[in-house]
Amino acid sequence: MLPERVKVMNKAIKNILLILFFIFFNNVVYSEIKVKIERIGAPIAHPWGISQIEGTHYLVTARSGELFKVDIATGQQQPIANVPAVFAKRQGGLLDVVMENSRVYLCYSRPMPDGKAATALYQAELRGNALRGGQVLFTSNFLSTSGHHFGCRIVLAGDFIYFGLGERGERDTAQDNALYSGAVIRLARDGSLAPASGDNWPKGVFSKGHRNPQGIARHPRTGEIWLHEHGPKGGDEINILQAGANYGWPIVSHGREYYGGKVGEGLTQAAGFADPVWVWIPSIAPSGMAFYDKDMFPELKGGLLVGSLKFRSLYHLSLDGEKPASEQVILKQKIGRIRDVMVAEDGAILLLSDEVNGGLYRLSRD
């Protein structure tokens, strides 16, 4: 048997090697930029989505079911009336918002019979401080009492509306071709479902195999739709969406189970499944995403901004061609959990802090 001091030394060496592994293979560059951080308006508990109305006026959702109009120049904040009822349980509630002209799109967890909920898309006209003529454009056909994995990020691109649905914590539904669960949905601007992009998929399904989409954006040059989603323990990923593609969850994943075991057979690639263009290990719990194409921060121009819930930080991903090549943390633990990211017309960066005492923040050149 080995002497006790040798056992201790072996254990110490293993610990040192483990630390060195994480330093060299999981390092993130921290390069915070000099910014002026301003809190805009009164606190909003757990804000989730932001979209510009016009000028300095923006809409901000709160997960509890409230919608606010906020003037980022004055901080004035006004509630919007006639918001649809929501299933405000755990991750559910009033989630993303996108506005174009006077038309407002809301993605939310819609209350259904027997205590269940479904991810849904709602459309209305904003007139003054109220929504008018509201209608539900889409309701998922997968109902659950679960308060997890609603997805719900929206982007408008060309003639279509795209939005991502999570699998509600029931992973196998992401591969069920009869369900909208774990899918990106595509609707025409009139609210009609676009043709299915894959064989035997329901109308409107553009892609499948998603776990929990939390960020979506249109690339300003290529027009491609980029989407990021949460993995389990590790394996958060960015995908460039292709019509008819299956992104693999839960058959393929770069993450592991929360208890440490393999997800399924532990596959990170398999025939018939699309690969991500970026993977985070360990997870950062990404949320919100925006391409930066303004001049206020020239060092960020042409890159991608991603918020992190887990590390309460803002990430900047530099692109090589049209794919991510490297990342750096440019704002670290200043405002809490970053839920959404948007770039204002003047180049300032708008962030939502998902905290009980959260709200809207503006980052500008110091």
Which residues fall in each region the model found?
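Bacterial N-terminal signal peptides
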Residues: 17-26
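Short, solvent-exposed aromatic-acidic interface loops
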Residues: 110, 138-142, 200, 255-257, ...
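Beta-propeller domain segments
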Residues: 92-94, 167-328, 336, 346-347, ...
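Bacterial N-terminal signal peptides that target proteins for export
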Residues: 8-17
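Short, Lys/Arg-enriched N-terminal segments with co-localized hydrophobic residues
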Residues: 1-8
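Acidic, Gly/Ser/Thr-rich repeat motifs that build Ca2+-stabilized beta-propeller blades
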Residues: 30-170, 218, 223-231, 282-320, ...
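Short, glycine/acidic-rich beta->alpha junctions
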Residues: 42, 146, 205-209, 333
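Repeated scaffold domains used in trafficking and secretory/extracellular systems
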Residues: 338-340
